[in-house]
Amino acid sequence: KSFDRAGVPWFNSPLMYKKGQMIETELFDTADKNRCVGKLEDGICVFVEGTAAVGDTVRAEIYKTKKRYLVASLKEILKFSDRRTAPRCKYFGLCGGCKWQHLDYSEQLRVKRKQVLDALEHLGGFETPEVADCIPAEEIFGYRNKIDMDFTDRRYLTADEMNIPEAELSKPLDFALGFHAPGCPFKAIDIDHCDLASEEMNLAVETVRRFCRDRKLSIYSTFTHEGFLRNLVVRRGERTGELIQAPPEFMLVI
């Protein structure tokens, strides 16, 4: 009987799997980095990245093999978990901001508490630490008082836009003001509306977008190192007890 370097029999080792191989598994737990955990029929542990949820049965593609586990990216959800909810944001799954909008809010709180427990146990070395339940937020949308967006001359295209001729696209390719997609530091999604920001902040962003785009103001390029516009910061402050008497104050930094 042959063994790998970790002492695991080859017939039951993650090293028998290959990058690019498709696997199917039911997810039973959560882990760090917004990953879910599943086990294959041979007992191999797999961490699945993407908008998955505990209780999902998924098809995923392996992209990393370790001595004790596999890491895979979500490709298809075969059976949906009852812990899911419909994401409110139309950019969810593309935008690198929100990670858990596909989870019911009570499930989000459970996952956050578990992350604290895991950190205390596995990193801190505490045995059976006591961690109270998470205190729910009063508002889960429209609560942010600051958003920081990037200008880019390379707009991120959705899968649907990839099949549309450039002349028929509703937005130009060389302008975007928004957030980066995961793994795309040089491209940004042109965000029309962020559900975490207030309506006033979204209006401010849209005003700046139209002003800069219509006047064709130059955007800084990370490739040529030329251009002017790089970032937009919108901050909203409300004085305690003066919401009716005084309007909110804004700060825009370009």
Regions found by a protein language model. Give the residues of each.
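N-terminal amphipathic/basic-hydrophobic helices that include classical n-h-c signal peptides
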Residues: K1-L15
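Accessory RNA-recognition modules of RNA-modification enzymes
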Residues: F11-I254
